[in-house]
C-alpha cells in the first residue's frame, strides 16, 4: 500500500501482492530492490531471497555466526532467531532475539560487519527428545532477550535492546 492511501483510504488497495513459494519464515519480510528477503527457520542459511513472483532464489542469504558451543541444526535456528530491517535497496541488518549480535549484510548476502554488544552474551539452547517430539529449550542460566523492532530510515538504522534475563521475577519484555 502507498502510505497516503493506507492512512486516508477506508478501503486501501494493495499496490503489489506476493505469494511465496515456501512459508518457513519466522519474522516479517523486507524489500531489497524488487526482491523480498525473510529470516528463515532453517539451519543452512539465516535468510532467503524471493523474486517478485514469490519464488525462492536457489542460494540462501548470509551465514550464521560461530557461537560459544557447537549447535545441532535445531538449536542453531532457535539460538539465532532474528528479525531484520533493510534499507530497501542493498543493506540488511539481521538483529538476533537471544544474543546481542547484529549482522550487517550487503544485498548479495555478504557479511559486512558483525556488531557484538553491548554485553556480549549468547543464550544457549539445548535439544530435547520427548517421545515423538523433538525440540529445543533455552538454558535458563543464559536465557536473555536482546534486540527487537529494528527500523531503517534513510541512511539510519534503529533497534531496541533489552538485555534482561527472561527468568527473573520482574522480567518484562517492554522494559
Sequence positions of predicted segments:
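Long, acidic/polar, low-complexity amphipathic helices and coiled-coil-like
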Residues: 1-41
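Beta-propeller blade signature
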Residues: 2-3, 47-52, 170-175
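Surface-exposed loop and turn segments in beta-propeller and other repeat-based domains
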Residues: 6-22, 57-77, 110-142
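Structural signature of eukaryotic scaffold interfaces centered on beta-propeller domains
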Residues: 26-32, 76-89, 95, 141-153
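Solenoidal tandem-repeat scaffolds enriched in leucines and small polar residues
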Residues: 30, 36-64, 68, 77-79, ...
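Entry beta-strands of beta-propeller and related beta-repeat scaffolds
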Residues: 35-37, 90-92, 155-159
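Short glycine/acidic-enriched loop and turn motifs that connect beta-strands
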Residues: 42-46, 99-101, 164-167
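Loop/turn-rich, solvent-exposed surfaces of beta-rich toroidal or solenoidal domains
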Residues: 135-175
Amino acid at each position: 500500500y502507498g502510505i497516503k492511501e493506507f492512512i486516508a483510504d477506508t478501503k486501501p488497495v494493495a499496490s503489489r501482492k506476493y505469494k511465496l513459494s515456501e512459508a518457513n519464515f519466522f519474522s516479517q519480510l523486507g524489500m531489497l530492490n524488487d526482491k523480498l528477503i525473510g529470516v528463515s527457520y532453517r539451519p543452512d542459511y539465516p535468510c532467503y531471497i524471493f523474486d517478485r513472483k514469490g519464488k525462492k532464489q536457489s542460494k540462501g542469504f548470509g551465514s550464521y555466526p560461530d557461537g560459544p558451543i557447537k549447535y545441532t541444526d535445531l538449536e542453531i535456528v532457535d539460538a539465532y532467531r532474528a528479525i531484520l530491517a533493510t534499507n530497501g535497496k542493498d543493506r540488511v541488518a539481521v538483529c538476533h532475539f537471544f544474543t546481542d549480535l547484529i549482522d550487517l549484510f550487503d544485498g548479495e548476502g555478504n557479511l559486512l560487519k558483525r556488531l557484538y554488544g553491548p554485553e556480549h552474551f549468547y543464550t544457549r539452547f539445548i535439544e530435547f527428545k520427548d517421545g515423538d517430539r523433538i525440540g529445543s529449550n533455552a538454558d535458563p542460566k543464559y536465557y536473555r532477550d536482546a534486540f527487537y523492532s529494528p527500523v531503517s530510515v534513510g541512511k539510519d538504522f534503529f533497534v531496541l535492546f533489552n538485555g534482561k534475563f527472561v527468568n527473573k521475577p520482574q522480567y518484562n519484555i517492554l522494559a
